[in-house]
Regions:
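N-terminal amphipathic, basic helical "cap/leader" segment at the start of enzyme domains
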Residues: 1-61, 159
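Small-aliphatic-rich amphipathic alpha-helix that forms the alpha element of a beta-alpha
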Residues: 5, 66, 72-120
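Short, surface-exposed beta-edge/turn micro-motifs
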Residues: 16-17, 62-65, 93, 131
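Short loop segments at secondary-structure junctions
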Residues: 24-26, 71-73, 138-141
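Acidic-glycine-rich active-site phosphate/pyrophosphate-binding loop
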Residues: 39, 60-73
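Short, electropositive alpha-helical surface patch
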Residues: 118-131
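C-terminal helix-cap and adjacent tail motif
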Residues: 130-159
Length: 159
């Protein structure tokens, strides 16, 4: 999967993706960083210990978690948006590869999974922007069928 990610397109071949893979007991550290992020962005009046515990414990739902980090290039000709899009392409490549291998894979973002404190916890050397995490494992049941709006509602044709 990581090899598939490596071949995603990036403007100027900047390859801005940075991944951290969490398996086994290392997920406990990741869960602690999720709980800390929840504590940091939740006002004291709204803080709920049960939600904090849920953030900490969610890492045990899947055996593998992969962070989706963006390390933008200093090149002035490449925008930060292009770097984010490149990492999104890398994530899509990983998700397609996971599916081809029969693995269940979910991209989880949100305030906790993209919080700067989580980024600092997993990448002390380089300041990253997190787009979230892929978590994956073997599906417990048959894969649900997807639903999408009709293509005609999403495409305009010009001649």
């Amino acid at each position: 999967m990581l090899e598939a990610a490596r071949w995603a397109p990036s403007h100027g071949q900047t390859e801005p993706w940075r991944f951290a893979v969490f398996t086994g007991e290392s997920r406990a550290q990741l869960g602690a960083s999720f709980a800390e992020a929840y504590r940091q962005f939740t006002p004291p009046a709204g803080f709920q210990a049960l939600n904090s515990e849920a953030q900490r414990d969610k890492v045990w739902k899947a055996p593998v978690w992969i962070s989706l980090g963006v390390l933008p290039t200093p090149k002035p000709t490449v925008s930060e948006l292009e770097e984010i899009v490149a990492v999104a392409c890398a994530a899509q490549n990983m998700m397609l590869m996971a599916s081809s291998l029969g693995l269940a894979c979910k991209w989880s973002s949100g305030l906790v999974n993209t919080h700067p404190s989580v980024a600092r916890a997993i990448s002390r050397k380089q300041p990253l922007t997190l787009l979230g995490f892929l978590y994956l494992g073997w599906p417990k049941s048959s894969w649900p069928s997807g639903k999408r709006a009709a293509l005609e509602t999403k495409v305009s044709w010009f001649e």
